[in-house]
């Protein structure tokens, strides 16, 4: 309280029960303080549980109270305390410090009364019961000489004091009565009445002061709160919380190009129902899962009082952009792609460089997918090689190989020269802008002509250094290991000229070389690190695939903890198989990776939707042109690696046919599953497995549903078989074969038969049931079938040139003399794509 604060007289509860005014407890001294205001004076009564003493102190008067009044109040209070002590002495109380507590209501009134009651201990109650013999006893208390002044002062204040003797255990009332006279002081007397003790009938509630009190009397007994009381108190607190509405927080909401209604509500910390209500006010019916555009979301957020920050959805990929510091750059190993025509010795060259037998493991002697290898030379320098397939079906994979390489080695067989895939590899390297090294292989074979190969290279603008060009042409033999050292020197020389550098610090980034699914290991992805250092436990995003790197192995199959730039590794831990050729990046957490993947999936979906109407227009055009009977060949393609599946799809979609539509229901990496069987059964599709097989359950389901499953290990065998299936679905070619001519010389009417033409076979042969064409004046007037063929009166199957015969047509009798009949047969021929 401040000195200027107005204080009103208030009642005070002293003791273990309820406290009506300021209450405090000092844990250090074990003392309880009760404060009350009398008149304009602050009175503090302190009971110490340690020393069992009672002290009274008076604070200064509020509002500049006169010091005289303060002294008078202090004197009055001391006199009242003296009466209490003397009453205790008369009750044979030898130790006043045992007064434990003051209970009930003690009202200090500024004009009249002072009432104080004390509680009794259990010992006092027992003593009281022994001494009570009458209901009321009047006791006269002798007042010593020094008490007259006290009684005179009490008379002036008209105070009546009630005191209870704690030792006897009886409630004693000291009634100080006097008759007021204006000019004299009357003699006062104190009447002490003994009143029958009333034991406390109600336990007191447990509170902090009761538990800390040293009162052992019966009146100090307490009771615990009932469950109902606790429940009522809790409900009351809940009602208070409900009534106190929380203050609304307005936020800055980041809104992308599209956002879900539920996501918008979460971003604003609003109820979904409130957001839907705002949308309804805008005339939009939506649910929590529906997606709305940024403009609508901005209106809703603004109406609800939030600030809006618009961002492009593509901004989620900004975290992938980082620049390397110049001082962090370090020299890295060159990445070399080996390309060329099939069977020209690319894998054998790598076999020689690695001193390992890779070619022996290739089915059909050709590379089926990209392989990445790291070769360490004798001087400690390293070269990373990427082996690409040479078959024509793997054009996309060769193109992808040139995009991640620093140097392209194009292998040309000395005995075979430039072929189709050789030219394609040259074009890929030129488009990628990478240096080219021509390796003329198989120079150990007899009857080779290296100059012829060089001349063929000139045609494609590949000019060697000896002819003044900038392309290094090195004759080698992978089988005999001839000039391999010169090839390595050429690679390192070009790499040194390019000054290849990358930063090994920071988050890793690179490109996906290949991906597959392996039973027991999950998704396996071969990647090439181009920047930073990839470590176990990193979160990466590759296209729409993401996950944590659980394990890394190098090209030798050894597990490693990290991979630096130009190091190819195989990782496992992605949630799905990524597309080969996509970039990968390390991000901070899985949520960031998921957001980027979802954004990319939405882009792919929008692109697919935009392409769909074109196909529909093409179908409508075909129907309008009358060619609506287009046959479909549904296929399900499963492969071991993504690059192989990509090559198969690319080759199949290139098969030309206007009558057969190849429909790829599903393509993926991994073994053939029961879901593939179910899809094939529902659509009557053929399942094609490339280097994969169906499981036991899938085989059982396929046999039951009679699904055609075909396995392949060489890609061109697969393509040839699909082409044959499509050819068998084509309508055959109907060819007309001329077999003879007949001249009608006379027409006869025969009963029950109709008109019969007497004819002469002028050329070839005429057969019964053959197709005929009737000409009159060299104009075709009828086409049909020959119904009757007779020689005299006998039915015959055929009549040759130079003989007469009788003929009749099916459902046609308009024949005349000198008409000419051409006889022919329709022959069907199987078409090929």
Swiss-Prot record:
The entry marks the following residues as binding GTP, namely 340-347, 387-391, 441-444
Q: Which GO terms describe its cellular component?
A: cytoplasm
Q: Where is this region: G1?
A: 340-347
Q: Which InterPro entries match?
A: EF-G-like_DII (IPR053905), EFTu-like_2 (IPR004161), IF2_II (IPR044145), IF2_N (IPR006847), P-loop_NTPase (IPR027417), Small_GTP-bd (IPR005225), T_Tr_GTP-bd_dom (IPR000795), TF_IF2_bacterial-like (IPR000178)
Task: Outline the segment boundaries, as ranges, of region: G4.
Answer: 441-444
List localization entries: Cytoplasm
Q: Which region ranges are annotated with the description G3?
A: 387-390
Q: Annotated Gene Ontology MF terms?
A: GTP binding; GTPase activity; guanosine tetraphosphate binding; translation initiation factor activity
Q: Where is this region: G5?
A: 477-479
Q: Which SUPFAM superfamilies match?
A: Initiation factor IF2/eIF5b, domain 3 (SSF52156), P-loop containing nucleoside triphosphate hydrolases (SSF52540), Translation proteins (SSF50447)
Per UniProt, which keywords does this protein have? Cytoplasm, GTP-binding, Initiation factor, Nucleotide-binding, Protein biosynthesis
Give a Pfam family name. Answer: GTP_EFTU_D2
Chief location: cytoplasm
Region G2, as annotated, extends over 365-369
Identify the PANTHER family for this entry.
Answer: TR-TYPE G DOMAIN-CONTAINING PROTEIN, TRANSLATION INITIATION FACTOR IF-2-RELATED
Q: What's this chain's function?
A: One of the essential components for the initiation of protein synthesis. Protects formylmethionyl-tRNA from spontaneous hydrolysis and promotes its binding to the 30S ribosomal subunits. Also involved in the hydrolysis of GTP during the formation of the 70S ribosomal complex.
Q: Which family, according to the similarity comment? A: Belongs to the TRAFAC class translation factor GTPase superfamily. Classic translation factor GTPase family. IF-2 subfamily.
Q: What is the protein named?
A: Translation initiation factor IF-2
Gene symbol of the encoding locus: infB
